[in-house]
């Protein structure tokens, strides 16, 4: 009797889950926009200073950049016949991050050195897949895995940065296809080797050309709230 009850319960759960999937309002194409808060966090490693025929070790300090951000996105959620959906999407961030600043200094028997540079990331484009779970026909939990490419400006040049993006969020239908959402995203842009030219001042007060070399790693996080339309 207990086995029969268990089987009945399992069948009812399967039927209920299938009904949720079939009635989910989040299958098909969608478009959305979001606004929120973003933080860009650069870090530096393997930093060296070449000057006066020597390789010196400078001190590096970094300040993160935080501020307003906004995104627009579009995609398609594929119906799977279960409460699970799979989405494909593209997301564009037109707003640049604030400037993140790095300062390098050296003081020793060879002389003194001081230099700084600012970097900001802009025009980010993220292509992602989004596995999702329909809680009911109006509510959706989802994750995001993708690749983000961005242009960056700083350290006396423009350059490209790209890396893995991860995120998760929640959507809920408000009315007639319109929905609200909340979302958290993380991007790891990997590392790049960058150089910065400057001058080291010797104890005799003579300026000597110096080159700062470092491996730069950058990550960004953002928290978004927004509105969208499910077609």
Could you say what each language-model-derived stretch is?
Residues 1-26:
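Cleavable N-terminal export/targeting peptides
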Residues 20-231:
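Gram-negative outer-membrane beta-barrel domains
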């Amino acid at each position: 009797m207990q086995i029969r009850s268990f089987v009945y319960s399992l069948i009812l759960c399967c039927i209920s889950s299938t009904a949720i999937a079939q009635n989910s309002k989040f299958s098909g194409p969608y478009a959305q926009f979001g606004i929120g808060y973003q933080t860009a966090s650069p870090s530096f490693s393997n930093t060296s200073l070449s000057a006066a025929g020597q390789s010196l070790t400078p001190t590096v300090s970094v300040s993160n950049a935080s501020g307003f951000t906004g995104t627009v996105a579009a995609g398609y959620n594929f119906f799977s016949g279960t409460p699970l959906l799979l989405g494909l999407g593209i997301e564009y961030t037109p707003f640049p991050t604030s400037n993140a600043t790095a300062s390098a200094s050296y003081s020793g028997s060879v002389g003194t050195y001081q230099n700084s540079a600012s970097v900001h990331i802009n025009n980010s484009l993220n292509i992602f897949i989004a596995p999702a779970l329909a809680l009911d026909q109006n509510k959706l939990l989802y994750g995001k895995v993708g690749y983000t490419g961005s242009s960056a400006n700083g350290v006396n040049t423009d350059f490209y940065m790209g890396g893995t993006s991860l995120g998760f969020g929640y959507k809920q239908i408000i009315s007639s296809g319109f929905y609200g959402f909340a979302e958290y995203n993380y991007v790891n842009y990997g590392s790049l080797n960058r150089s910065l030219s400057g001058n080291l001042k010797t104890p005799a007060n003579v300026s000597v050309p110096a080159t700062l070399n470092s491996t730069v790693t950058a990550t960004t996080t953002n928290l978004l709230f927004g509105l969208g339309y499910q077609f």
